[in-house]
Amino acid sequence: MGSRSVKVVLLEEIAVDGAPQLKYSVKKTHIMMPGDLDPDQAAEKAYNDVLASAGLTRDQVSAVFVTGAGRKQVAFATEGLTEMTAGAKGANYMFPSARTVVDVGAEEGRGMKTDAEGRAVDFAGNEKCAAGAGSFAEAMSRALQMSLKEFGEASLLSDKTIPMNAQCTVFAESEVVSLIHSATPKNDIAKAVLDAVASRVCAMVRRVGIEGEVVLIGGMVHNAGFVESLKGAMGVEQISLPAMPEYISALGCALIAAERQH
């Protein structure tokens, strides 16, 4: 249950050489529009869409686990999990050697330290401020009249380092406007913004420690400029990126639900 959308992953148990194995077979997103304010209704719609596309009924699903800010409002869920528990498990499934997981979505960012079983053993987050999350970058891209994708691509064309001191969206937007008025190239402004977001995210991750393989999950994986800024801030040469970053926490929920059925 994200701030912008609901993600669903359906896990199916199949037999491989006589042994049961899990396969994630269906994923579906229902975008929560501005008037769609009921998390339970949004979750119901997304869940029903997945069941219909898989040709299943609710009676054929053994458990429904949910995570995210709206998890307590999803009445039909079997159990709710924290974002850290679900994200760590999903990241571990995709990258078994991962020990540092960074989760950056629209409204929140967090860093997690995980063990070999995909359990979050420590975490730090920015739940009270969007300055370390995707919505901050999105607001700044609007100030430059660019899409978020264009914003990320533009930042890759800059090699300048421009510090941004503002700690909230309102003041940062004023800073961006000042840079525009001083004829600073858009590429340099885009990099400055993404560097600032990456710096705040990195500060959270450093509170739990950076070790082992680093994995980035959440919607900001799609922003190539942010990924590069985060590498620089963390001082790492590589960050592992899953193919379906928005679904990793939903996948983690499904994996934990499956484990608890056995």
Where are these regions (language model features)?
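Short beta-strand-loop/turn "lid" adjacent to the catalytic site in phosphate-handling enzymes
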Residues: 29-35, 52-85, 121
